[in-house]
């Protein structure tokens, strides 16, 4: 029997045959505006509601903005932070600014992966985290793509070793076929790709699970929506991308 972590995202656990296998490190890959951050927020929030503490690593946005973004969907994490069940790791500000001085977990040099991992370990242990999201892991190797696989492997050892089930957000360009860095797809346990394609003059969101160690999963591309309550995946519908895109 596979021990699974439910994402809690409507429709997502159906195409994962029940959820992400525990301790898996999943690469959440996609272009700009595809919903990667929202997916990771929703995953952490649903964990909190199920009694699973979490950690969010902010590499691309100010921690204050992260909390605002989450609250817009009704996911106010501040009470969980006060209870010691949720933490934001500030790997964005380098500790600069008045708001940053109020953050408990600050990475003073976000380009120092070793330092980031030390602060992340502290946060995971302090809150007893079961779920972690890093947004985005690509930021750690933008200047040196050759380090992509090594960076993901380092994070995987720590995250899996500490018993967490984790999402690493990975940025790709709109036209890029890969997953956001050379070799990262081999280092991750799972890959979920989010896309945005034009259909008859409208943008359609879809996702596909490229791989997921330890479980069967849907091999089809499914449409999803972003609502005011978060992401909804439609497991019974399929998006076909060829010379033209169609939904069935």
Curated annotation (Swiss-Prot):
Gene3D superfamilies: P-loop containing nucleotide triphosphate hydrolases
Residues bound to ATP: 30-37
GO MF annotation, one: ATP binding
Family matches, as PROSITE patterns: KAIC
Domain (KaiC) ranges: 3-247
InterPro entries: KaiC-like_dom (IPR014774), KaiC_dom (IPR010624), P-loop_NTPase (IPR027417), UPF0273_KaiC-like (IPR022475)
Keywords: ATP-binding, Nucleotide-binding
Pfam families documented for this protein: ATPase
This protein's record includes keyword Ligase: no
Matching PANTHER family: UPF0273 PROTEIN TM_0370
Protein family membership: Belongs to the UPF0273 family.
Name of this chain's protein: UPF0273 protein APE_1505.1
Organism expressing this protein natively: Aeropyrum pernix (strain ATCC 700893 / DSM 11879 / JCM 9820 / NBRC 100138 / K1)
């Amino acid at each position: 029997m596979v021990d699974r972590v439910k994402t809690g995202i409507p429709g997502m656990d159906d195409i994962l045959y029940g959820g992400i296998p525990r301790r898996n490190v999943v690469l959440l890959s996609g272009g700009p505006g595809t919903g990667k951050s929202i997916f990771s927020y929703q995953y952490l929030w649903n964990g909190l509601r199920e009694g699973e503490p979490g950690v969010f690593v902010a590499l691309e946005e100010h921690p204050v903005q992260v909390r605002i973004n989450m609250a817009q969907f009704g996911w106010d994490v501040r009470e969980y932070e006060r209870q010691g069940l949720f933490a934001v790791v500030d790997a964005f500000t380098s500790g600069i600014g008045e708001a940053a001085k109020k953050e408990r977990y600050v990475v003073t040099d976000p380009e120092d992966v070793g330092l980031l991992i030390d602060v992340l370990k502290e946060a995971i242990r302090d809150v007893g985290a079961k779920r972690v999201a890093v947004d985005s892991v690509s930021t750690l190797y933008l200047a040196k793509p050759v380090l992509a696989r090594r960076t993901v492997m380092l994070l995987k050892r720590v995250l899996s070793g500490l018993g967490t089930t984790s999402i690493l957000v990975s940025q790709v360009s709109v036209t890029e076929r890969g997953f956001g860095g050379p070799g990262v797809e081999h280092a991750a346990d799972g890959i979920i790709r989010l896309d945005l394609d034009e259909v008859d003059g409208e943008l359609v969101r879809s996702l596909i699970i490229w791989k997921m160690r330890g479980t069967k999963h849907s091999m089809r591309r499914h449409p999803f929506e972003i609502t005011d309550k978060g992401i909804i995946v439609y497991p019974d519908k399929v998006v076909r991308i060829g010379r033209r895109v169609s939904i069935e």
